[in-house]
Design a protein with these regions (language model features):
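Short, surface-exposed, low-complexity cationic segments
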Residues: 16-39
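Charged interaction scaffolds used for protein-protein
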Residues: 1-9, 31-44, 64-120
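Short, well-structured hydrophobic secondary-structure segments
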Residues: 48-52
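Extended alpha-helical interaction segments
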Residues: 1-5, 11-16, 20-24
Length: 120
């Protein structure tokens, strides 16, 4: 998947590094042990169409680019004429396709009440 910010096209990668970056910020700590909870934390926000969550997910998925836009540039991209509803849809579909997020997405889809907003 690609997005265009400030006339430059960037790749998005929803692989292991993406998960590591999410897990570094979204985790549960029990008895001094941190357990990554990144994907589980952001998917409900994507389903409910939370723009701040979408911005965070896009920013972390941009890790694959040598020169990636700043979080502020991603925010501005979303605030402009971007078809944000389509972008939510596309990101959720990509998360279902990625080899490293597919199983978690399947489990989340089965457990969350509003999963009809995630297309097959």
């Amino acid at each position: 998947m690609e997005i265009k910010i400030n006339e430059k096209t960037y790749k998005l990668n929803f692989g292991i590094m993406f998960l590591r970056k999410l897990d570094a910020v979204h985790y549960i700590e029990e008895k001094g042990i941190k357990i990554g909870f990144g994907l589980n934390s952001v998917v409900p926000g994507l389903i409910s169409r939370n723009a701040a969550t979408l911005s965070e997910v896009l920013y972390y998925a941009l890790w694959v680019n040598n020169e990636r836009p700043t979080q502020a540039q991603v925010d501005e991209f979303l605030e402009k004429d971007t078809n944000i509803e389509q972008l939510f849809h596309d990101v959720l579909i990509e998360l279902q396709k990625s080899n490293v997020t597919r199983t978690s997405m399947k489990n989340l889809k089965a457990s969350l009440p509003e999963t009809d907003r995630i297309s097959e």
